Amino acid sequence: MIVDKLLDDSRGGEGLRDAAGGCGLMTSPLNLSYFYGASPPAAAPGACDASCSVLGPSAPGSPGSDSSDFSSASSVSSCGAVESRSRGGARAERQPVEPHMGVGRQQRGPFQGVRVKNSVKELLLHIRSHKQKASGQAVDDFKTQGVNIEQFRELKNTVSYSGKRKGPDSLSDGPACKRPALLHSQFLTPPQTPTPGESMEDVHLNEPKQESSADLLQNIINIKNECSPVSLNTVQVSWLNPVVVPQSSPAEQCQDFHGGQVFSPPQKCQPFQVRGSQQMIDQASLYQYSPQNQHVEQQPHYTHKPTLEYSPFPIPPQSPAYEPNLFDGPESQFCPNQSLVSLLGDQRESENIANPMQTSSSVQQQNDAHLHSFSMMPSSACEAMVGHEMASDSSNTSLPFSNMGNPMNTTQLGKSLFQWQVEQEESKLANISQDQFLSKDADGDTFLHIAVAQGRRALSYVLARKMNALHMLDIKEHNGQSAFQVAVAANQHLIVQDLVNIGAQVNTTDCWGRTPLHVCAEKGHSQVLQAIQKGAVGSNQFVDLEATNYDGLTPLHCAVIAHNAVVHELQRNQQPHSPEVQELLLKNKSLVDTIKCLIQMGAAVEAKDRKSGRTALHLAAEEANLELIRLFLELPSCLSFVNAKAYNGNTALHVAASLQYRLTQLDAVRLLMRKGADPSTRNLENEQPVHLVPDGPVGEQIRRILKGKSIQQRAPPY
């Protein structure tokens, strides 16, 4: 190390700058005295050159080290001093050093201070000076190429702005919520990092010289040519036009921020594009909805409304491949109200329905100031559609929801075929007189009887209403049957229900004393029976289930007798797959359903006929009808009629035991015995069931069953 004295004040400024830049300080006074003792003599300047050439800057020494290697430390420091003198300019010749502590030094003038040179700092300064030379050469190259740097003065001033920008500082005039970001990569990262001994102000003083490198200028050129100040919080969206919207004022930005987003209306299924290419614009123009050559004037932004808002951006010209449609025209106006009313068919209730072809009057009043230039349908299209509707009533073109909300149209849509037929029949019978309605043929049948027999429901309904108005609904033909009874016999359950609802009497009888229920029971019309019950409940009529015919039979008796006949035919027929057997099976099923329906309606099984006093169980036992016997005995009240006697004193067990040549006789007797029939009961001739059993193998089995039961009952209690 070498201690240099500053000789004169002429180079004092440069020396102070070097001293301030070095920031070298002595760490110990012992080292200072030690340093003075280790100074080489002034007569050896060549030794310094030799040592610098041999050692060089590769072996620097610490200024505060206590090493004993004096030659190494002194040689490195002397080299640093030589370099310092070469940078600072010509120095004055060294004066003879005064002898201090036995060592001679050159005299350099009055002592002004001590500077300790740091070799590491000198190395950094050397590297920076090399960069400054390279940057100066690059600037000269750019000047020779004709690059104008004046146009980038504004950017350079922004980049070289002194000091670190603080948080609250705003670089734009806009509000803080939409402040545009500066797209400069060198703004937050300075090109050089100052050392701890340097201040930020010194760094910014040297910054303009160090930023003039080739890479920095190239980055500035790229930033200026390619980028524009765009806010990171704002997305510019355009449906068709890719032109960048110019930067708006802070007031407009604030209004956009608080007022909500405003988009242009979708142009006829147009795809969503953001700054698309020209080729994409041509493809998207095919789907444009607005008319050709339509330019919307720029309007100020309004507050958000539920109505349709449009963008103030100009619409680009159409593509050559664009095909005009019905709604395109040179003039754009809203459709007149008269044409819309004709299109909707005078539907007053459909005004509240959202229709793409029409806007409500209230909406038009609200937006009349700024939507007068925007059209959704030209007047020519309205006229074309009105003319098309007038030309053809059965046109397929119709507006959606045009029939909604109209009570007449709702009734029209909900009308059934029967209602339409009734209207047709009423129009046909409008001119029929009263005498013609009441006229009869040779058999005493009226128009109503004939219509019911033919199954013409609509005509029967119209005639029945007209006959009921004349109080002639229950008029009868030559057999004493009314139109209602004819409908029951014809198995027209719908007509039966209509007639009962109109007012036909359900308990009327014919010439045989049969009520409509007797006819249903004999024929097995279970659906008609249900229709009578339903109609009677609706018309508040009482149905007499115990009414008897001239034979004294109730409807249930008639149904059992009819079923016995079918069972007898099935037992006698030996061809199970013949058509006759299939028909009998169907009739058998219908009769069983009719009997069940009668029981459900409330028919009494224990009811007796007027002539013989037989119950329904007696009638079922006469044919060994297992199906009906089982049906009756499964009722909760079976014990009240299982031992019921007829007028001759016979029970159902007497009847079943006395049968001959019946395949199901044994099963019928066993079933009756199991359900509580008494074999000891005697009739008027003092006969028990066992006395009536015929001879034969089947008779022996029946006697065994009856005796076994009777023996158990007659057994003595001991």
Swiss-Prot record:
This is NF-kappa-B inhibitor zeta. One of its GO terms (biological process) is keratinocyte proliferation. Residues 58-83 have a biased composition (Low complexity). It is found in: Nucleus. It comes from the Eukaryota. Keywords: Activator, ANK repeat, Nucleus, Repeat, Repressor, Transcription, Transcription regulation. Involved in regulation of NF-kappa-B transcription factor complexes. Inhibits NF-kappa-B activity without affecting its nuclear translocation upon stimulation. Inhibits DNA-binding of RELA and NFKB1/p50, and of the NF-kappa-B p65-p50 heterodimer and the NF-kappa-B p50-p50 homodimer. Also seems to activate NF-kappa-B-mediated transcription. In vitro, upon association with NFKB1/p50 has transcriptional activation activity and, together with NFKB1/p50 and RELA, is recruited to LCN2 promoters. Promotes transcription of LCN2 and DEFB4. Residues 1-17, 84-97, 201-211 have a biased composition (Basic and acidic residues). Induction: By TNF, IL1/interleukin-1 and bacterial lipopolysaccharides (LPS). The gene is NFKBIZ.
